[in-house]
Every structure is written in structure tokens, then in C-alpha cells.
């Protein structure tokens, strides 16, 4: 039976689905300054693509100066590669680089129109950040998260002490970019119960202006991409730990048999072993379904500090 509540949810879902084709790109022009929290691979990628494609100044925040330095070095490397391949000129590269304004202070986000959080997948960390953003950012700013598995409704709830006051929580949304951001076109748009249609429209328009192709997912554990992808990676790890196949054979059969650019174990290294574990934990804890239980080897690798490409060692050595 379709209850009144379910009917409203279905109608809202239909409206949000339609907006993907109707949202005007011009809305992105209202974003005069972007904020990005986290200078890691994801955050830096988002900041760089926004500066290059949309041409907006980007305040890049990370409390760790070493992370900022590493991120900017990576940005310089990517821009230099684009120049060498004649995708952009040196003048364009310099312009893009000048749009990135790194800082260790969250208070620097006081003048942004749109902020995207891209820190590690730790619920308490994200909740704390959004609680701060509610106090720092202007009242019109869109507060987006790049979370790959945590409930948007829960994140939005941290922005207010009064659940009936949705003036801030209505501006919270997920723009889950795919890694690596400069290459992958996909982005998941996930709304919480509080998210307004205006927030959805603005987020979609801005993502399109970045050259991305948005897809919508319900606010469900893992959303779409990781609900499908992570069990695939986890099962590959189980096959390795139980001796069903070697590392090379597992990756080879999936790469050559399904026409994907890399096998599941190499992909796990690229994503980050710790990130894979964090997402599997959320899926398992939120659903209670044993098919999402993280493999023993996955847990052990995180304990060992073998986090994949970013640590120099994972299923492969880098």
C-alpha cells in the first residue's frame, strides 16, 4: 500500500529526477567563490577542475600545511602535464593556478557561495565540520559533502540544534565526485530529508558547469556507486585471502573479461584501502546484511598501514 508519506517521497523523487535535464547551467554563474575542505586527492581534484572549467576562485582549506603543500605540488604536476600535451597554454595554467587560494583556516570560508567537504570518511569528523560550516558560511551558501557512504540527512542534522529550523540544513547536499576527479565524468547527487529543491538545482548546475554528468541516488547506505562497487572489491579481496586466485589472476580476469581499465585489487589501491574499509563498515553497520561484512584481509591491511597508492604499499608496491 502506498501511504501518504511514501506518495510524497515518490513525488519528490520524480521532481528531483526531472530537474537533472532541466536545471539551467546559468545557475552556476551565481557561484562567485567556491570553498573546498581537504587538500587530498579528492579535494584537490575538485578544486582544480572547478578553477579550470568554471573559472571561479577556490578557497582550499586543510588544517595540515603539509597536506596543502603536497596537494599544490600535485596540482602543478597535473597542470604541467596539460601544458606539455598542449591541452592548455602556459598562460591558462598560470591563471588556473592563481585561482587556488590555500589556507589552514576554516574562517576563510566566510565569503564562499558553495563549499564542498572532501575529508576522510570518518562520520564524527564530517559532523564536526558541518557544525562549524553552519556558523562560518554565509546564510545563502550551499554546504556540500563528498561523502561516499554517510547519510546526508544525518550530516544535515548537525547544522542546527532545532530540527524544525531547516534554514541551514535545507542547504546541505552530497556531490559525490568519482576518483580521479579530473578524469571521471560521473558525480552522484544525494539529498537528505531536509534538502531544498533550490539546493538541488544549484548543485546540479554547478556540477554540469564543471563538465560532470550528475546521477541521483537516494540517501541510502553506500548510495549507488559504492553500494555496487565496494562489495565487488571486497569479494575480490576475499578471493585473494581464501586462495581462490592470485592477485594478478584476479585483476587480469576482471580487466580482460569485463573491459574495465583496472582490476578490483588495483582499483582498491587507487581508492585507498582505508577508504574501502570505511565504506564497507558503513554498509555493514547500516544494513546489518552479512554480504557487506568487510573481509579479514581488508581490515589487516589497514592495521598494517598498507593503504594503497597513497602509502606506497597496498596489493601492489608503488
Predicted regions mapped to residue ranges:
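NAD(P)-dependent Rossmann-like dehydrogenase/reductase catalytic/cofactor-binding core
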Residues: 2-32, 37, 54-55, 197-201, ...
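Hydrophobic/aromatic beta-strand patches that form the interior of the parallel beta-sheet core
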Residues: 59, 101, 116, 173-175, ...
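Structural/interface elements that position substrates and couple domains in central-metabolism enzymes
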Residues: 59, 212, 229-233
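NAD(P)+-binding Rossmann beta1-loop-alpha1 motif at the extreme N-terminus of oxidoreductases
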Residues: 2, 12-81, 85, 136
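Rossmann-like NAD(P)-binding element
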Residues: 63-70, 80-143, 150-151
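Methionine-biased hydrophobic packing positions in alpha-helices, especially
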Residues: 42, 175-178, 184, 254, ...
Amino acid at each position: 500500500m502506498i501511504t501518504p508519506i511514501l506518495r510524497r517521497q515518490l513525488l519528490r523523487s520524480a521532481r528531483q529526477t526531472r530537474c537533472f535535464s532541466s536545471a539551467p547551467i546559468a545557475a552556476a554563474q551565481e557561484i562567485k567563490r567556491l570553498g573546498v575542505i581537504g587538500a587530498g586527492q579528492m579535494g584537490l581534484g575538485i578544486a582544480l577542475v572547478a578553477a579550470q572549467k568554471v573559472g571561479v576562485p577556490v578557497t582550499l582549506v586543510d588544517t595540515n600545511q603539509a597536506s596543502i603543500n603536497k596537494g599544490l605540488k600535485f596540482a602543478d604536476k597535473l597542470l604541467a602535464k596539460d601544458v606539455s600535451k598542449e591541452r592548455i597554454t602556459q598562460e591558462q595554467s598560470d591563471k588556473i593556478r592563481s585561482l587556488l587560494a590555500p589556507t589552514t583556516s576554516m574562517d576563510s570560508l566566510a565569503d564562499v557561495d558553495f563549499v564542498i567537504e572532501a575529508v576522510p570518511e570518518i562520520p564524527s569528523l564530517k559532523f564536526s565540520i558541518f557544525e562549524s560550516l553552519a556558523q562560518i558560511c554565509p546564510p545563502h551558501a550551499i554546504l556540500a559533502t563528498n561523502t561516499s557512504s554517510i547519510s546526508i540527512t544525518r550530516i544535515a542534522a548537525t547544522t542546527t540544534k532545532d530540527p524544525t529550523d531547516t534554514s541551514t540544513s535545507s542547504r546541505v547536499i552530497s556531490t559525490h565526485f568519482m576518483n580521479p576527479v579530473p578524469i571521471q565524468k560521473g558525480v552522484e547527487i544525494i539529498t537528505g530529508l531536509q534538502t531544498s529543491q533550490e539546493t538541488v538545482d544549484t548543485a546540479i548546475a554547478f556540477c554540469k558547469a564543471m563538465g560532470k554528468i550528475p546521477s541521483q541516488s537516494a540517501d541510502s547506505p553506500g548510495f549507488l556507486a559504492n553500494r555496487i562497487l565496494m562489495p565487488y572489491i571486497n569479494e575480490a579481496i576475499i578471493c585473494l585471502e581464501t586462495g581462490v586466485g592470485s592477485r594478478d589472476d584476479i585483476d587480469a580476469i576482471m580487466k580482460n573479461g569485463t573491459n574495465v581499465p583496472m582490476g578490483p585489487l588495483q582499483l582498491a589501491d587507487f581508492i585507498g584501502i582505508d577508504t574501502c574499509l570505511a565504506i564497507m563498515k558503513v554498509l555493514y553497520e547500516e544494513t546489518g546484511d552479512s554480504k557487506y561484512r568487510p573481509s579479514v584481509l581488508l581490515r589487516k591491511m589497514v592495521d598494517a598501514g598498507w593503504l594503497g597508492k597513497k602509502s606506497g604499499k597496498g596489493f601492489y608496491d608503488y
